[in-house]
Swiss-Prot record:
Pfam families: FTSW_RODA_SPOVE. PANTHER family: CELL CYCLE PROTEIN, PEPTIDOGLYCAN GLYCOSYLTRANSFERASE FTSW-RELATED. GO terms for molecular function: lipid-linked peptidoglycan transporter activity; peptidoglycan glycosyltransferase activity. It catalyses: [GlcNAc-(1->4)-Mur2Ac(oyl-L-Ala-gamma-D-Glu-L-Lys-D-Ala-D-Ala)](n)-di-trans,octa-cis-undecaprenyl diphosphate + beta-D-GlcNAc-(1->4)-Mur2Ac(oyl-L-Ala-gamma-D-Glu-L-Lys-D-Ala-D-Ala)-di-trans,octa-cis-undecaprenyl diphosphate = [GlcNAc-(1->4)-Mur2Ac(oyl-L-Ala-gamma-D-Glu-L-Lys-D-Ala-D-Ala)](n+1)-di-trans,octa-cis-undecaprenyl diphosphate + di-trans,octa-cis-undecaprenyl diphosphate + H(+). Residues 38-49, 103-145, 191-193, 255-279, 334-343 are periplasmic. GO terms for cellular component: cell division site; plasma membrane. Pathway: Cell wall biogenesis; peptidoglycan biosynthesis. It comes from Geobacter metallireducens (strain ATCC 53774 / DSM 7210 / GS-15). Residues 1-16, 71-81, 167-169, 215-233, 301-312, 365-375 are cytoplasmic. It comes from the Bacteria. This is Probable peptidoglycan glycosyltransferase FtsW. Belongs to the SEDS family. FtsW subfamily.
Length: 375
């Protein structure tokens, strides 16, 4: 794999600067909001109000470095590494279950423990799946329209990945990867009746997955009527609503939120947008949503104008992943969707998510340098 890190102003202009600006701005904003949302809790738990800020700052620097590396690698080179990368990620997903290697938290086994850092392989697996599908869809071309060659093999792969993720109690990542895969197949020309049939067949299984597992069933019931159990299953979403209500139109002011003071669970991770809503108001939330929308729209433009099918599928998969995660997170914190445990890209606290997200943006930026009409 050829790497070239020499950058000049003329070369930078070849990248989609809107995508680059949105990614960097959201990341910087995320570092600020992680500190605001976590400082009180960090002071009590670690006797250091800057604990999460320092870690998120390091993750942001590493993520930006990963993005720069990905920007400088010709995206077409990922084609030959797609299969080994996917196999490597499958191995990492399985290592999570080995005692002494894997780590668990709140009943979920999703991490591989390293000194000072926990790696979440599911974040890597999302990009690995996109790379592999882009490579495979490019290779199959018209064969993707047939069930035996263009649909069934991907469903087998998806079933294996989702089974591992469900064993890790990571339904959010499983649904996200499933959604990305289905949309990539649809964009590639898979017959809609195959997709519709698969969705219909999956619904009973999904119902069983949710209603047969106590904590998932309670989440659905809390989603339908959080006030029925406001001190337990409905507590988190009610506190989130209170945060948005306190913020109003213009917010209480940066750092002035009250719900993060041990009222709102996961204030610096999954529910960080609630803190944004309380401190920066509806205006702040709209600005964040608009930035995500702009990033997604520019990403779709890159996909549509890519010079080759591999670049088109790769860009489409990445922008779909970012869009789904942002939409689901916003839906959860506002009560439009049941609680899923998905981070808000760029903004929520978390090393694996931030670094992998910025790396994916770097790939997208490289595709943007080789669109139709560019040399």
């Amino acid at each position: 794999m050829n790497l070239n890190f020499k950058l000049n102003l003329k070369e930078i202009e070849r990248y989609d600067l809107v995508i680059l600006l949105m990614a960097v701005a959201l990341t910087c904003f995320g570092v600020v909001m992680v500190y605001s949302a976590s400082s009180v809790m960090a002071t009590k738990k670690f006797h250091d109000g800057f604990y999460f800020l320092k870690r998120q700052g390091i993750y942001a620097i590493l993520g930006c470095a990963a993005m720069i590396v990905a920007m400088r690698i010709d995206y077409r080179q990922w084609r030959e590494y797609a299969v080994p990368i996917l196999l490597g990620c499958l191995l990492l997903l399985l290592l999570v279950f080995i005692p002494g290697i894997g780590g668990a938290a709140k009943g979920a086994s999703r991490w591989i423990r390293f000194p000072g850092f926990n790696l979440q392989p599911s974040e890597l697996a999302k990009i690995a799946l996109i790379m592999y599908m882009a490579y495979s869809l490019d290779k199959k071309q018209e064969k993707v329209k047939f069930f035996s060659t263009g649909f069934a093999p991907y469903m087998v792969l998806l079933a294996i990945l989702l089974a591992i993720l469900l064993k890790q109690h990571d339904l959010g990542s499983a649904l996200t990867m499933g959604g990305v895969a289905i949309l990539m197949l649809f964009a590639a020309g898979t017959r809609p009746r195959y997709i519709l049939g698969m969705v219909v067949l999956t619904l009973p299984f999904l119902y069983f997955l949710v209603m047969n597992v106590d904590y998932r069933r309670r989440r659905i019931l809390a989603y339908l009527n959080p006030w029925e159990d406001p001190t337990n299953t409905g507590f988190q979403i009610i506190q989130s609503w209170l945060a948005f209500g306190n913020g109003g139109i213009i917010g209480q002011g940066l750092g002035e939120g009250k719900q993060k003071m041990f009222f709102l669970p996961e204030a610096h991770t999954d529910f960080i947008l609630s803190v944004v809503g309380e401190e920066l108001g509806l205006i702040g939330v709209i600005v964040i949503a608009a930035m995500f929308l702009m990033l997604v729209l520019r990403g779709v433009r890159v996909a549509l104008m890519a010079q080759d099918p591999f670049g088109r599928f790769l860009a489409f998969g990445i922008v779909t992943l970012l869009g789904i995660q942002a939409f689901v997170n916003m839906g959860v914190v506002t009560g439009l969707l049941p609680t899923k445990g998905l981070a808000l890209p760029f903004i929520s606290y978390g090393g694996s998510s931030l670094i992998v997200t910025l790396f994916a943006v770097g790939i997208l930026l490289n595709v943007s340098t080789r669109m139709k009409g560019t040399p």
